[in-house]
Amino acid sequence: GSAWPSMYTEFGVPVSYAGIISMIIALGTVISSLMSDRITIKLGAGRVTAISVATTAAALLGFGLSHSFWLICLIAIPYGLGAGSIDAALNNYVALHYASRHMSWLHCMWGIGASVGPCIMGLAIAHNNNWSAGYRYISYIQIVLTFIVVISLPLWKKRGGAKDEASDGACASETARAVPLREIFRIPGEKAIMLAFFCYSAIEQTTGLWASSYLVFVKGIPAQTAASFAALFYIGIT
């Protein structure tokens, strides 16, 4: 969203087409999130995290190399798929093996990452007038993170002993199973939590997608400044 005011003119599409990309990413995220339980039991939280980070890194690099709207839409599919599983897998892993304060730190790190992205994009637009460079810079960071996660894979099995081995794929068939959605819907308070999370996600995604465009087209702020200002929202929720 932070780069869209600079992107849409190059693609020759209406400003509203950002919504198409967002919906494709959201659809992929929902699908991979719903499948995350089964995938994590089969592969383990560490491998799911590594694959997801690598997938999003490749997709971001693809964004940075693309100059076609429809190609961006195509690349948005693996980006969404990679973004969904990692959230569910990491949250579940931390909830099982760490204290609640560690969950807060996990979400804090997400907020920092989400805040840094628009700032990097703003700098790329300001210095190079090139949104593509911003995506490439972010993809390079993701690639480094991929290597870090891959190197740390042996550590995932050390936390929690046998309990962790089950969550990381070993002996999963004996100790864990994927919970069907119909069972999840029977959990007391689950529907209220889903509704609250839906409302939060709607606000977060709408603001993240359109904040930069609003600042450019309504407030007349330069694109590079608006891209950086979009980070303030994520800083606020962090």
Which residues does each predicted region cover?
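Conserved MFS/SLC helix-loop-helix module at the cytosolic interface between two early adjacent transmembrane helices
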Residues: 31-70
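Juxtamembrane intracellular "pre-TM" segments in multi-pass secondary transporters
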Residues: 156, 160-194
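Cytoplasmic helix-loop-helix junction between adjacent transmembrane helices
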Residues: 75-111
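Extracytoplasmic gate region of multi-pass secondary transporters
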Residues: 1-4, 188-231, 235-238
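Short hydrophobic/alpha-helical segments at membrane-entry points of transmembrane helices
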Residues: 68-76, 192-193
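Small-residue (Gly/Pro/Ala) motifs that create kinks and tight helix-helix packing interfaces
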Residues: 4, 36, 113-126, 212
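Symmetry-related core transmembrane helices of the 12-TM Major Facilitator Superfamily/SLC fold
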Residues: 133-154
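Residue-level signature of mid-helix packing/kink "hotspots" within the transmembrane helices
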Residues: 25-34, 115, 234-238
